[in-house]
Structure formats: C-alpha cells, structure tokens
Amino acid sequence: MPRKGPVKKREILPDPVYNDKVVAKLINKVMYDGKKSIAQKIVYGAFDIVREKTGKDPLEVLEAALNNVMPVLEVRPRRVGGATYQIPIEVSPDRRLSLGIRWLVEYARERKDKRTMKEKLAAEIMDAANNTGGAVKKKEDTHRMAEANRAFAHYRW
C-alpha cells in the first residue's frame, strides 16, 4: 500500500488515426510482445472491414458493441464464517470498459470461422453490436451469476 496518497492513474494517449482513447486501449489489448504497429494494422484493418460490411462509422459500431458487452454487475468471492460466498457487486466504469475490451479481443482470438485476426476482430465487433457472439454471452453469464447470488448482496463491503 502506498503511503503518499492514492496512486495516480496513467493517462493513455489517443490513437493517431481516430484520435480516440477507447481505440488506443483496444490496440494495446490486441498487442503482443510490444509490437504496437502490428496491433494497429490489425485494429485499423478490422475497422475497414466493419465499414465495408455495415456501411457505418466503425467507431459507432465499436461503441454499440462495447455497450452490449460491458457488464454492470459481477461476483466477487468473500469469506464469511468459514464459507466463501460469491457476492454480486457493481462494476466501476473504468473496469466495465477494460472488461468489455478484454472480452471482445479474447473471443475474437478464439473464433475459428475466419483466417486472419483482423477478420476475427471485425466479426466479433459486428456480432457484439448485434447482441450476439461470445463476448455478449460472457456478459450474460456474468449477470446470471450475479442474479443467482443476489441473496448474498447484503454481505457487500
């Protein structure tokens, strides 16, 4: 625990093409081994595919996808009297965004239907914007867990 007050959050710079911080976070999440230029090619290529297939602005489609993927509730384990309960808690806005981006990229990587990562990412973004796909299913599962454990909500800290 730091003694000099709360830890400062690092400010992320917006990406060069769309000048958007969410896109910059998406690029950082796609990046492997510090290879940012490759991650940028993947994300911008996926955005080109989204623009081509939907005819809409890819930022709007990404925003719609993230709104359908970001969880409102999640469960956290808490020990109470020798038993561990799964306690539903609200998710902070920063964590909602990072979970949404993480799940989009994770389920895009797992897809078997496309060949390249940019095709997979574009397909996952479009599916999430249409309320389908693996990332949306993950959010629904998370909400279902929170709803099932609603009886333990009074143990919140």
UniProtKB/Swiss-Prot annotation:
**One of this protein's Pfam families, by short name?**
Ribosomal_S7
Q: Does the keyword Translocase feature in the UniProt annotation?
A: no
**GO molecular function per UniProt:** rRNA binding; structural constituent of ribosome; tRNA binding
Record flagged with keyword GTP-binding? no
What is this protein's function? One of the primary rRNA binding proteins, it binds directly to 16S rRNA where it nucleates assembly of the head domain of the 30S subunit. Is located at the subunit interface close to the decoding center, probably blocks exit of the E-site tRNA.
One GO cellular-component annotation of the UniProt record comes to: small ribosomal subunit
Question: What is the protein name stated in its UniProt record?
Answer: Small ribosomal subunit protein uS7
Q: Which GO terms describe its biological process?
A: translation
* Entry keyword set: Ribonucleoprotein, Ribosomal protein, RNA-binding, rRNA-binding, tRNA-binding
Q: Assembly state and interactors? A: Part of the 30S ribosomal subunit. Contacts proteins S9 and S11.
Family statement drawn from the similarity comment of this UniProt entry = Belongs to the universal ribosomal protein uS7 family.
